[in-house]
């Protein structure tokens, strides 16, 4: 059984009203594309996988909520804003109608570490994962998803590989997991679609 979709950080969740849908249209469009491809979804154990985010301002970002992979379509009740995080304390603060995705700390570090990144997509696809393992920047196999170690692994990949240029990474210890990022959702999404070629 593959573990996925389980929150491993301390979340200070400030429940609040949803963001206006007008702020989420492009995010939702790309999330729907990833869902249609089966790259965001739910596994046989009914645990959701995959997530998507956009930078809001500074290091704040809007991300799909926890356990939303099982939903075919999302609305503004399914997104939340991460407003701060502390890697050392394995914690973050999210404001919105839903808990932040289990991979939020990883997104946070990428946004902080590369100011040109404005969108991140985390998908699951076994064939692409296997094909691109060690062809693209790849996390160490012993690193678990959703942990401070995974977030720190992003820093290692930025420092020691050509991740900043490739903008796609494979999560060796998170079966099927691939992350792409870009200046916008179109770039992040198209980098994933290009892997199909």
Regions picked out by a protein language model, each given a short descriptive name:
Residues 1-197:
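Glycine-rich flexible loops
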């Amino acid at each position: 059984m593959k573990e996925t979709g389980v929150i491993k950080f301390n979340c200070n969740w400030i429940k609040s009203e949803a963001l206006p849908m007008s702020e989420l249209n492009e995010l939702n469009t790309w999330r729907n594309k990833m869902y249609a491809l089966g790259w965001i979804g739910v596994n046989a154990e009914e645990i959701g996988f995959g997530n998507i985010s956009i930078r809001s301002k500074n290091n704040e970002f809007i991300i799909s909520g926890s356990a939303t992979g099982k939903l075919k379509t999302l609305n503004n009740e399914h997104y939340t804003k991460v407003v701060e995080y502390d890697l050392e304390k394995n914690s973050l603060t999210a404001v919105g109608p839903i808990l932040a995705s289990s991979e939020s700390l990883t997104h946070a570090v990428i946004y902080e570490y590369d100011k040109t990144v404005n969108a991140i997509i985390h998908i699951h696809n076994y064939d692409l994962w296997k094909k691109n393992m060690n062809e693209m920047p790849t996390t160490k196999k012993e690193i678990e998803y959703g942990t401070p170690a995974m977030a720190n692994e992003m820093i290692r990949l930025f420092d020691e590989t050509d991740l900043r240029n490739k903008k796609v990474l494979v999560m060796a210890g998170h079966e099927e997991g691939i992350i792409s990022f870009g200046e916008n959702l179109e770039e992040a999404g198209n980098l994933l679609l290009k892997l199909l070629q």
